[in-house]
């Protein structure tokens, strides 16, 4: 049986994100000239602390926040102990009389201190309760651990504080008003002065992101490839998603940083996991470790459950009293945050996208209120409100009514009932357009299953979107159930996937010079992980197992290039971005738009625009979203997609961050007529955009540009997927330990590169290499990205990345027997399957 070598290898120089000639560079600095920040060993932790200090708005805010977290834990434990052991509830509930005077017949007013037990009685009751003593001892040990960790972190963050002041020259008072891009630019400049990393002369933006997001990128890839057990089919409820903070913590503990994890340190995978010869033994070892951690979770379940209940009660009781409808609000689920996250996307960037999509997402979910539920809510509000009105009127007439037993309780419950019922009654003046709302949501969240488009009005789409955008009450309930469910998921669902996880980390881990071991998906290389239906046809050599799903590679690459305009992408990424820009220019030229504005004003445009803020970039998105249904007669669905694609392309083509009254000067003027990427790249060095306000404006326009690109790329993907719907469908099978090969692809040859369908209004297709427009447009991208000479597909030799790796994914009609290479015997009884991925 043919077998392949899956030996982990060092990343090639063209993939290392290093300047030529610096791949094995070791910078030497004289002893007397070393700065305090020369050769920082753990750059992952250092850059993460730099980022955290920026996000927490400086050292003082971070210090006070950490102190309050310690105080919160003490308060919850102490207050709960006091309520259990030091309160006489018979007096509090008036079941026992209290006499303060010498005359028992005189009426006595009970005060709150009367219900408190004396200190001696309270102490005796605590000592008699063995369970309470055990819980207090465990809580005390945990609090002391947090206190020691707090002191250590303060010492470390004081060093980061000094780094901001002396190396980056950013005072703490100005830090809350500095964007992360400004801080990152100063870090890149500081590398040249202090040699923070001695393995590279210069740091890039991608290096910093890789250091901060090393483990997060692995988690995003694991969710993208459906390797983590997060979806379950429940009897009577159908498919459900369960992903909580406790479950995520256990995943990270097992895989990344816990004792016996897969990583030797923050930046290096253990050597045995880089070789395929012991994969079965390593999988068994991982399975046993998951079992023991699951058992530990089961034993600690009572304590964790008590803590979860108490913390949720103290956190949400006041909110529920003040705003009863708060639990009816929605939030982005933890699974949704991981599914929607780009590779190399920091937490504040993700949060900004999701915040922009929150209002349209809420309005979309409100479109599906049940008519029966609305009818019941209206009548329930009527009956409860009538009784409440009578009680309030009686109270106004005579306040002694409140002294009647349970009157105040009844008033409170009736008020909560009325508030809850009103939350299920839709606004009678609101007009809902589910398809338009879903398109607005897509513009911000960037990811969406293909079958949602055109089916926004269906309950199935609503239910699937609810997995990403869940009720706050459901979120709290899942967190409360997490201590019980997490051990079951670890023992019975995660353990059977141990072999697939081992294969995943071996096949998709690469070593980057000056960075260490990273997830290969985080390199955003369309050649190795691109999807042919996401504009990568002819530019990717990835098998179905190697390609990222839902266009994650392509959209992540576009997002990172727009967010970091100074980044120089690799050759293949530059070719992809150039091809996308060329397609945008062609589709934009095909759209006939009115002079003086993108789209005319109309009622639907105004209603869609009301979903957004008043800023100009978001209004541009509203124009594009409303355009396809506001102008012209109804068209068939395929022609509507072409028209919509042309409109988005026109918006991108004319997109410019300059306000109408500003006059561009110099080099910026010549680039503003191109895509937004070029415009912002040129303007980032211009005096027009200097200052903090200009940085925020550029960030807003970058977000809008990415939203337009997401709409455009999804439309292209939809049309290309319709052309070949079954070619790139993949599924995950159980790990094959027998080494059997995949189905033979014998007769199928290499696929020819396919061109992306053009707009329906585009008259004809000129050959790409000879088109003068292509040459001119690509010249701008050459100046922007360091350039290539040919805008077409980059010629390359056949790569070992075209092989189909382990893990059980198989491409329809294809075999796994490509480029057979024998594996030398290692004396191991583990047998490798013939589908491998060599990095």
Swiss-Prot record:
Changing residue 265 to W: Impaired autophagy. The keyword Lipoprotein does not apply. A motif (Tyrosine-based sorting signal) lies at residues 8-11. It catalyses: a 1,2-diacyl-sn-glycero-3-phosphocholine(in) = a 1,2-diacyl-sn-glycero-3-phosphocholine(out); a 1,2-diacyl-sn-glycero-3-phospho-L-serine(in) = a 1,2-diacyl-sn-glycero-3-phospho-L-serine(out); a 1,2-diacyl-sn-glycero-3-phosphoethanolamine(in) = a 1,2-diacyl-sn-glycero-3-phosphoethanolamine(out). One of its GO terms (cellular component) is recycling endosome. It is a multi-pass membrane protein. Residues 1-20, 656-686, 717-839 are annotated as: Disordered. Residues 737-747, 823-832 have a biased composition (Acidic residues). Residues 85-128, 398-406 are lumenal. One of its GO terms (biological process) is negative regulation of interferon-beta production. The modification Phosphoserine is found at residues 14, 16, 18, 656, 735, 738, 741, 828. Changing residue 8 to A: Abolished interaction with the AP-4 complex. Its main location: membrane. It is found in: Preautophagosomal structure membrane; Cytoplasmic vesicle, Autophagosome membrane; Golgi apparatus, trans-Golgi network membrane; Late endosome membrane. PANTHER family: APG9 AUTOPHAGY 9, AUTOPHAGY-RELATED PROTEIN 9A. Homotrimer; forms a homotrimer with a central pore that forms a path between the two membrane leaflets. Interacts (via cytoplasmic its C-terminus) with ATG2A. Interacts with SUPT20H. Interacts (via the tyrosine-based sorting signal motif) with AP4M1; promoting association with the AP-4 complex. Interacts with ARFIP1 and ARFIP2. Interacts with PI4K2A and PI4KB. Interacts with ATG4A; the interaction is direct and promotes ATG9A trafficking. This is Autophagy-related protein 9A. It comes from Homo sapiens (Human).
């Amino acid at each position: 049986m043919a077998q392949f070598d899956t030996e982990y290898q060092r990343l090639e120089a063209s993939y290392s994100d290093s300047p030529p000639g610096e791949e094995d560079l070791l910078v030497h600095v004289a002893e007397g000239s070393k700065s305090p920040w020369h050769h920082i060993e753990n750059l992952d932790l250092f850059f993460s602390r730099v980022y955290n200090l920026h996000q927490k708005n400086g050292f003082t805010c971070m210090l006070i926040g950490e102190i309050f977290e310690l105080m919160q834990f003490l308060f919850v434990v102490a207050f709960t102990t006091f309520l259990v052991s030091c309160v006489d509830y018979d007096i509090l509930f008036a079941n026992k009389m209290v006499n303060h005077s010498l005359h028992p017949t005189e009426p006595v007013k009970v005060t709150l201190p009367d219900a408190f037990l004396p200190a001696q009685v309270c102490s005796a009751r605590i000592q008699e309760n063995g369970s309470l003593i055990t819980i207090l001892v465990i809580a005390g040990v945990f609090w002391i651990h947090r206190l020691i960790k707090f002191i250590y972190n303060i010492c470390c963050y004081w060093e980061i504080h000094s780094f901001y002041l002396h190396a980056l020259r950013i005072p703490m008072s100005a830090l809350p008003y500095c964007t992360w891009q400004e801080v990152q630019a100063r870090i890149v400049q500081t590398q040249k002065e202090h040699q923070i990393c001695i393995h590279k002369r210069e740091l890039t933006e991608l290096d910093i992101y890789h250091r901060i997001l090393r483990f997060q990128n692995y988690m995003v890839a694991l969710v993208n490839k459906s390797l983590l057990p997060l979806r379950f089919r429940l009897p009577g409820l159908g498919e459900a998603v369960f992903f909580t903070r406790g479950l995520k913590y256990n995943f990270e503990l097992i895989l990344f940083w816990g004792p016996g994890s897969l990583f030797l340190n923050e930046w290096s995978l253990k050597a045995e996991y880089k070789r395929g010869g012991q994969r079965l033994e390593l999988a068994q070892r991982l399975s046993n470790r998951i079992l023991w951690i699951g058992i530990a979770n089961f034993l600690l379940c009572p304590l964790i459950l008590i803590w979860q209940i108490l913390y949720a009660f103290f956190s949400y009781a006041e909110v529920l009293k003040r705003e009863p409808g708060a639990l009816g609000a929605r939030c982005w689920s933890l699974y949704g945050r991981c599914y929607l996250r780009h590779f190399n996307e920091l937490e504040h960037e993700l949060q900004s996208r999701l915040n922009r999509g929150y209002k349209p997402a809420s309005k979309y979910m409100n479109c599906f209120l049940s008519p029966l539920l609305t009818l019941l809510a209206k009548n329930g509000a009527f009956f409860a409100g009538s009784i409440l009105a009578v009680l309030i009127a009686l109270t106004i007439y005579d306040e002694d009514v409140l002294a009647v037993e349970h009157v105040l309780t009844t008033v409170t419950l009736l008020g909560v009932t009325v508030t809850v019922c009103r939350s299920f009654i839709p606004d009678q003046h609101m007009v809902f357009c589910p398809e338009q709302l879903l398109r607005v949501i897509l513009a911000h969240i960037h990811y969406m299953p293909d079958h949602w488009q055109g089916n926004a009005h269906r309950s199935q789409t609503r239910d699937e979107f609810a997995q990403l955008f869940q009720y706050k009450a459901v979120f709290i309930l899942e967190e409360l159930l997490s201590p019980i469910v997490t051990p079951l998921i670890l023992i019975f669902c995660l353990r059977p996937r141990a072999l697939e996880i081992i294969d995943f980390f071996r096949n998709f881990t690469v070593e980057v010079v000056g960075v260490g071991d990273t997830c290969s998906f985080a390199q955003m290389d369309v050649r190795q992980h691109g999807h042919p239906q996401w504009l990568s046809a002819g530019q990717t050599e990835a098998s179905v197992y190697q390609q990222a799903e839902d266009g994650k590679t392509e959209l992540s690459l576009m997002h990172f290039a727009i967010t970091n305009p100074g980044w120089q992408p690799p050759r293949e990424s530059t070719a992809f971005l150039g091809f996308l820009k060329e397609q945008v220019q062609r589709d934009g030229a095909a759209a006939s738009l009115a002079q003086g504005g993108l789209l005319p004003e109309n009622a639907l445009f105004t209603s869609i625009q009301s979903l957004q803020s008043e800023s100009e970039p978001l209004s541009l998105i509203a124009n594009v979203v409303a355009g396809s249904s506001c102008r012209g007669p109804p068209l068939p669905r395929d022609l509507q997609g072409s028209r919509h694609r042309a409109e988005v392309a026109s918006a991108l083509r004319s997109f410019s961050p300059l306000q109408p009254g500003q006059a561009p000067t110099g080099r910026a003027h010549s680039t503003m007529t191109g895509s937004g990427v070029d415009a912002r790249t040129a303007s980032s060095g211009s005096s027009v955009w200097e200052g903090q306000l200009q940085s925020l404006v550029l960030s807003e326009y970058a977000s809008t540009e990415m939203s337009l690109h997401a709409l455009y790329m999804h439309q292209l993907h939809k049309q290309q997927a319709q052309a070949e719907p079954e070619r790139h469908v993949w599924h995950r099978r159980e790990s094959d330990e027998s080494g059997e090969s995949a189905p033979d692809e014998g007769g199928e040859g290499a696929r020819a590169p396919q061109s992306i369908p053009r707009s329906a209004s585009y008259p004809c297709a000129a050959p790409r290499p000879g088109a003068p427009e292509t040459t001119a447009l690509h010249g701008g991208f050459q100046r922007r990205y360091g350039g290539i000479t040919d805008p077409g597909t980059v010629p390359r030799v056949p790569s070992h990345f075209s092989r189909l790796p382990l893990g059980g994914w198989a491409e329809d009609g294809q075999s796994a027997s490509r480029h057979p290479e024998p594996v030398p015997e290692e004396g191991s009884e583990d047998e490798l399957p013939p589908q491998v991925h060599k990095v």
